[in-house]
């Protein structure tokens, strides 16, 4: 396909126009008095949101250069969302401010490479100052506050997220589901749960609840199909002699092996339940390994030289209780070695850090939660489908925001932390003139989030920035009330990770804008004009 090329100032200004259009739609959502944006969908009802990355993803511009500029700023929002789960609007506002200042200086003759270097040095100092300002989350109320802010000031969402995190811990998984009822509900899962139920309903022990409950069972974990009773019989006899029930987790249990377990259960000779192993392929192998570590068993597999017919009780795991329904299995208080469990948790954390796939990261996070924490499900309901989707999205954002706060701590919110950190830009900075100009650009850009919050609240941005600059450190504008307060005491807080990521990603993309000297884009296809109708153009009957 033919290409078109723009150079120097024309190229940069084309990118800037695209950035301005995207940033204009995103930044109106910043702060407690930020507005919503309605997004048209090809199918179904429109979406209403105040989430920066959701808005950015929907924007596609017609002009090829503007489209590229918008795509570059989209990356700021996406990257910030991936790393920290929030701060996408702040990142977009910072990027726009840095690019405006930078292009003005490049047009005036400044060296773009030196400006970029100055930006990088300043950002490094600001991130260090943010770390100094950061405070650990000490109370459940602080978790509720930071989650509420991310959820657009909805305190009910903040409270339920704080409750969920209190129950499942730092590494626990909090999922959000749509509910048919109004309001919010919290459902907690005790122990490790995976989504495979009993193979046969004959294993049920509680007819009323349609579940099988085993107290203090042995647990067999096998990455094989079990169909021959002669393979299983030696182990069954040993378990029967021990007088305990048995949970069998295998690739499949079928044929005479399944029939033997069912017949003995019905006759009351021996209590057991068979379930299929969760997952497929390599993921199944990993999840069986997790179950084995949690319960203190070994995975019976020919790959590691272990055969079922030779298995002893030493290879089986234990748990205080197992509950199996038709859809899932829950293992409560597995008897695995705490040291081995901690090692497995560290291994999964390391895999999460190295993974560059969102899907893989999500699955690893679920495995981590099953081992180290627990699973909490927040069920959200609303009056209409549009409101339900918007509310669910806000809760998901708030959960990630709260987790980021637990991870790296909190700083004063409302743009105050960046304003405070701007004082560190020139600390010990000895650089050439253009690099110093780059650092000054960062110092100015750090006031923009506060300025935009004030503008969205109907106030004069410049006046508010100067007022806050002259207040005691840590004090700022509560845009919801228009009063000046101690931000930490008022519960107006941001996760340090979110603020840091927003600045770093904004600076990165600004550097790319400034050092761009040519843009190559696809030539737009010419639209064919409709042919004039033949004849006199009269009506036809």
UniProtKB/Swiss-Prot annotation:
Pfam families with a match to the protein in the record: Cpn60_TCP1
Residue sites binding ATP per the record: 29-32, 86-90, 414, 478-480, 494
GO molecular function term, any single one: ATP-dependent protein folding chaperone
GO cellular component, one term: cytoplasm
Record-linked Gene3D superfamilies: GroEL, GroEL-like equatorial domain, TCP-1-like chaperonin intermediate domain
Enzyme class: isomerase
EC numbers on record: 5.6.1.7
Membrane-traversing stretches: none
InterPro entries linked: Chaperonin_Cpn60_CS, Cpn60/GroEL, Cpn60/GroEL/TCP-1, GroEL-like_apical_dom_sf, GROEL-like_equatorial_sf, TCP-1-like_intermed_sf
GO biological process terms, semicolon-separated: protein refolding
Subcellular location: Cytoplasm
UniProt entry keywords in alphabetical sequence: ATP-binding, Chaperone, Cytoplasm, Isomerase, Nucleotide-binding
The reaction(s) this protein catalyses: ATP + H2O + a folded polypeptide = ADP + phosphate + an unfolded polypeptide
Keyword Hydrolase attributed: no
Purpose: Together with its co-chaperonin GroES, plays an essential role in assisting protein folding. The GroEL-GroES system forms a nano-cage that allows encapsulation of the non-native substrate proteins and provides a physical environment optimized to promote and accelerate protein folding.
Subunit and interaction comment: Forms a cylinder of 14 subunits composed of two heptameric rings stacked back-to-back. Interacts with the co-chaperonin GroES.
Family, per entry: Belongs to the chaperonin (HSP60) family.
Protein name, UniProt field: Chaperonin GroEL 2
Protein's gene: groEL2
């Amino acid at each position: 396909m033919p290409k078109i090329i723009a150079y120097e100032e024309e190229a940069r200004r084309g990118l800037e126009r695209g950035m301005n259009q995207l940033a204009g739609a995103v930044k109106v959502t910043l702060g407690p008095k930020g507005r919503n944006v309605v997004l048209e969908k090809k199918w179904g009802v429109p979406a209403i949101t105040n989430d920066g990355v959701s808005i950015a993803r929907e924007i596609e511009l017609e002009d090829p250069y503007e489209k590229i500029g918008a795509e570059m700023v989209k990356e700021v929002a996406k990257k910030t969302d991936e790393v920290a789960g929030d701060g996408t609007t702040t990142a977009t506002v910072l990027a726009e401010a840095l690019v405006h200042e930078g292009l003005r200086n490049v047009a005036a003759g400044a060296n773009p490479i030196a400006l970029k270097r100055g930006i990088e040095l300043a950002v490094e100092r600001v991130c260090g100052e943010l770390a100094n300002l950061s405070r650990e989350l000490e109370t459940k109320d602080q978790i509720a506050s930071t989650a509420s802010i991310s959820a657009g000031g909805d305190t009910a969402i903040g409270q339920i997220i704080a409750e969920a995190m209190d129950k499942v811990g730092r590494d626990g998984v909090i999922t959000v589901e749509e509910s048919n009822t109004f309001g919010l509900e919290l459902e907690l899962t005790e122990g490790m749960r995976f989504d495979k139920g009993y193979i046969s309903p004959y294993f049920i022990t509680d007819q009323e609840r349609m579940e099988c409950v085993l107290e203090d069972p042995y647990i067999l974990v096998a990455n094989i199909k079990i169909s021959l009773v002669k393979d299983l019989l030696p182990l069954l006899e040993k378990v029967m002699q021990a007088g305990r029930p048995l949970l069998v987790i295998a690739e499949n249990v079928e044929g005479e092996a399944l029939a033997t377990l069912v017949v003995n259960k019905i006759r009351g000779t021996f209590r057991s339940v068979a379930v299929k192993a969760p997952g497929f392929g390599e993921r199944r192998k990993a999840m069986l390994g997790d179950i084995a570590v949690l319960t203190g068993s070994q995975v019976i597999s020919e790959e590691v030289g272990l055969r079922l017919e030779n298995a002893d009780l030493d290879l089986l795991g234990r748990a205080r209780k197992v509950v199996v329904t038709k859809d899932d299995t829950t293992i409560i208080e597995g008897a695995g070695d705490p040291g081995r469990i901690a090692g497995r948790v560290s291994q999964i954390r390391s895999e999460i850090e190295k993974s560059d796939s969102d899907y893989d990261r999500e699955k690893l996070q679920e495995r981590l939660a099953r081992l180290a924490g627990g699973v909490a499900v927040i069920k959200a309901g609303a009056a209409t489908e549009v409101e339900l989707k918007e509310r669910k999205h806000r809760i998901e954002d708030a959960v990630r925001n709260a987790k980021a706060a637990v991870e790296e701590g909190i700083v004063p919110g409302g743009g105050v932390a960046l304003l405070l950190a701007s004082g560190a830009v020139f600390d010990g900075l000895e650089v050439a003139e253009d690099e110093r100009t780059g650092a000054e650009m960062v110092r100015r850009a750090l006031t923009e989030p506060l300025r935009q919050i004030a503008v969205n609240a109907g106030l004069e941005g410049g006046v508010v920035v100067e007022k806050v600059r002259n207040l005691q450190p840590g004090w700022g504008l509560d845009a919801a009330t228009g009063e000046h307060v101690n931000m930490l005491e008022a519960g107006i807080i941001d996760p340090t990770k979110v603020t840091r990521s927003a600045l770093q990603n904004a600076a990165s993309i600004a550097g790319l804008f400034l050092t761009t000297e040519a843009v190559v884009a696809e030539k737009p296809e010419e639209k064919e004009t409709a042919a004039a109708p033949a004849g006199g153009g009269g009506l036809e009957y």
